[in-house]
Amino acid sequence: MKRENRVVQLSGWGLSLVMVLVMMVTSIAGQDAGRKKFLKKPLVIEDQGSFFIGGVPKVTNYATLPAPNAANPAPNQITIGQMYVQFQIPANKKSKAPPVIMVHGSTHTAACLESTPDGREGWAPYFVRNGISTYIVDQAGRGRSGFDQSVIHEATSMIRSGDVQNGTARIPNFGRITDNGAWTAWFGHLMPAGSTILTGTLMRHGDPGDPATDDASHKDTYLPAYPIGAVDPSIVSRNGAIAQAPAGPNNYYALDYYKQLVPNAEVTLPGSTCAACQPSELSPANTWTPRDLALLVEKLGGAVVATHSQSGIMGHHMVRILKERGHLDLVKGLITIEGGCSLANSGLKAEDFDNIPYMAMKGDYAATSMQCQETVDAINARRAEGKGIAKAEYIKLDELGPVFNGTTHMMMLGTNNLEIADVILNWADENIPPKAKKVRK
């Protein structure tokens, strides 16, 4: 009798547990159903993953920081200069479309290519949705690619031992755009002129009193095409803030976008030299990421490379490296978005792009880059001479219509980001692979 009661009791507990689990799953499903989706619609992929490419071994006594007055630890090996790669392959690939590699700019990582600060679809999934195998990277020395901490440890150890001058000289200068620096670079101004964040206030382009800018072609009658309203309420209210608060407005200092700004830790890597480049001394940024991009292009058997801002010149250095290896044919296209386009800096010539489609692009708040214009003109001069077949074009979004009004430097995160992506995709459809002009008889 007692055993029967126990069975009944256990059955009751089991039924109660099942009911609790069902309620939990139902609750979670309900919460998920109400969640705002980042993607426009389900994304069908064949494969996705991540890997690292490139890098070299380094033996160092400073993989860790020795304690004060302690002997240096035994040598250890670390790997530096590698690059993190994340990819998605669509289930329905566009016929004959090469993969695209997207490269972020200064102070950013590949996060800026995944989704927008207000929770919308980013360029990477949108390209996949359009049938393009897409690879996004964290520059060597940045984000998930990691940096060389031994440089800082060695400098610290030297300073502790009394060699302050040489130790201090070894400490790298980490560049990082500040929150208000990003604002004044891309979204508006700090007013009045000459003020600091403690004495002046932030103003959007297009707000009343927006001063005329020297370089931008935008009109002061419209606002940046950017999700400036996507803010963190906790930061707006200055919860846990350190030091004195800026003059405001607080919401302009609380953009969710600011959270993805990171130090340019590639400065911990060594630089290099390039005999064909002007100047011949190359920064760490223009040394490692171009090498890794070249390796990635070779691994993929060819790709289009789309760069932004700081990485613009890196894309050109990558082309040079592939040229030196006899693999220029693997570059299926080079796209430079508000970045450097100098052929001389990267050791290239216009003839190197005879069979490589080349596109430069600018938004609404940047002046026309004479450097990019000159490169496009030099390539097209060869077309006028009947040399080469690949298209070269400088697309200025501010000339294409109202949908591009207010396009900022961070256009991949803007409110019109997918319209801009369509411009790139349509250009690629028309020009990659390059088509020889038919000779009229």
Report the location of each language-model feature:
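The feature captures the conserved acid-bearing segment of alpha/beta-hydrolase catalytic domains
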Residues: T336-L397
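Gly/Ala-rich beta-loop-alpha elbow adjacent to hydrolase catalytic centers
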Residues: A306-G315
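Bacterial N-terminal signal peptides
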Residues: G14-T26
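Conserved acidic catalytic loop of the alpha/beta-hydrolase fold
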Residues: T287-A303
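Short, surface-exposed "cap/lid" segments of acyl-processing enzymes
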Residues: K93-S95, V100-D138, R142-R144, D148-H153, ...
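Catalytic active-site module of serine/aspartate enzymes centered on a nucleophile-bearing elbow/loop
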Residues: T407-K441
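Conserved alpha/beta-hydrolase fold motif
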Residues: V305-A306, L334
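N-terminal cap/lid segment of alpha/beta-hydrolase-fold proteins
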Residues: G34-K94
